[in-house]
Amino acid sequence: MRDLRRHSSTIFVAFLGGACTTSSDATPDSDGIDEASAGADTSAGGTGTGTGGAPSTTATDDPSTPGSDGSEGGGSDDATSSPVVWDVGVLGDVPGFTCGAPSVFPCDDGDDDPWHAIGLNCPGGSQVEGEVNGAPEAFYVHEGNMGTFEPPPFPPREGDKFLVMSSGNAQDMTVANMFASTDVAGFVDGGVNPPAPIVVTSVSPTDTCATDPGLVGTGDCSNTIQEQWDQGSGAHDYAEMRFTAEVPFMTFGFSYDLAMFSTEYPNYYQTGFNDMYIGWLESELWTGNISFDEMGNPISLNAGFLDYKDAPNPFDCPGACAAPELAGTAMVGHAGTKWLTTTAGVTPGEDITMVFAVFDVSDGVLDTVVFLDNFQWGCEGGAPVTIPG
């Protein structure tokens, strides 16, 4: 202790002419996959970078890395594993197909229900069976932008509010310059593995479930968790939101938005105290993490989507390193990501489980925080991807 201290069926449908279309424009690229530009439409199926097994194709026409020009809180980030990407389409990528994804009905203005805050279980909208597991103080529904920087970097992505989930006290995130470090009673605690269905082990040394669908159900389809998990010694202060749902008719994917921050930076950056966020999907097409960076790392302290760094570190920001975007939050002097958007493909009519989990790694101090918002069923399927929102 530091002194701080997943119906397995396959559906085949043939159409004459026939993938989902959205209101945003999308142009087929050389691999035949429709790819909307990043930031155009936040419905499922936006472009980005996914993780897979062997030689691969990119899922974006823009190979740049977030922050590579040094303009956002400390410049580019070095990742800890080799870049591996892929692009997989399903029925949602067949031109002319009509999408049946339900509309979004925000309803978070009248209460602090965490499911309403992320865009679920609203009247007339998507309904799920949800659980909230962890210390009560690990969950906080926030209204409006987080922090004081202008233009606001962290406004709600749908409705008026978003969910803050923490490995400590989530509401601490609203206190400027606070050193957020609370050891709470986690849903799981004491250096153990995350609860089922999450499995930290990779499905294969060489393949993901995208390259070998027979691996579904044998571990983490993305192969993104184990390497970083093995750097530490188990989960502490674990908190999660999880839901089960039947995928709506003629719906082939979903998306949600997230951002992650950690007090572990800078002192424990690139060490075994690699606090993590995992977005785990349990489905017919995928069992594993769906939120990861372009280099194959989960969303963690040591991952390459760490856009805002408000202190120097000897690895990738040895000089002046500032992130005014974090002003007015507990992460002043620490680090976080931009809003990110994760998308993943699913099968219409199947039952899925989705888990949003955050936890400390190796000990229970120095908090890590995740924002969650804007869950939407969408038109396009394919492999999981995460992009800057």
Language-model segment annotations:
Residues M1-G18:
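Sec-dependent bacterial lipoprotein signal peptides
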Residues P83-G389:
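Aromatic (Trp/Tyr/Phe) and Gly/Pro-enriched flexible surface segments
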Residues A19-P95:
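Ser/Thr-rich, Pro/Gly/Ala-heavy low-complexity intrinsically disordered linkers and tails
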Residues D3-L4, S23-T27, N302-G304, F375:
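Glycine-centered secondary-structure boundary/capping sites
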